[in-house]
Amino acid sequence: MLGTIGVLLAALFFGAIGMTAMFRPHNLLKDFGIETAAVDSRNEVRGIYGGFPIAVSGLLLFSLTRPDLSNGILFALAACSAGMAIGRIISAIVDRHLGKIPLLWGMLEVIVAFLIASNITAR
């Protein structure tokens, strides 16, 4: 059981995604063939790929300080990470294709879901 280390690694993962989206939005999506040349597209990247992961990272860190709230926080965030991976699987089935980059991100999302879930305790 990875416990606290797993939560810290997951917080680092989401924090890095969020900060990259905030300050280098074009870097985050270029490997997927998505352009962020328009101002509105960068706003979208910063909002969704920046703001959400930064909030997730903050909640993961907060969960380490509040054992009374941690199980709910960790369960919800593990489900979010797993949900992203499930979305990739559904996309691969519908499109009959899964590229190397989406596969890599999907594997990372599954690993992160397990890292987060490893700190959920029975009560």
Predicted regions and their residues:
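N-terminal signal-anchor transmembrane alpha helix
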Residues: I5-A21
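Anionic, Ser/Thr-rich low-complexity intrinsically disordered regions
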Residues: I17-T20, R24, I34, A92-G106, ...
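Alpha-helical transmembrane segments of multipass membrane proteins
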Residues: G18-M19, L60-L61, R88-I89, F114-A117
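Cytosolic, membrane-interface loops and tails of multi-pass inner-membrane proteins
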Residues: R24-R42
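Core segments of alpha-helical transmembrane spans in multipass integral membrane proteins
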Residues: R42-L64, A79-C80
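Transmembrane helix-loop-helix
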Residues: S63-L103
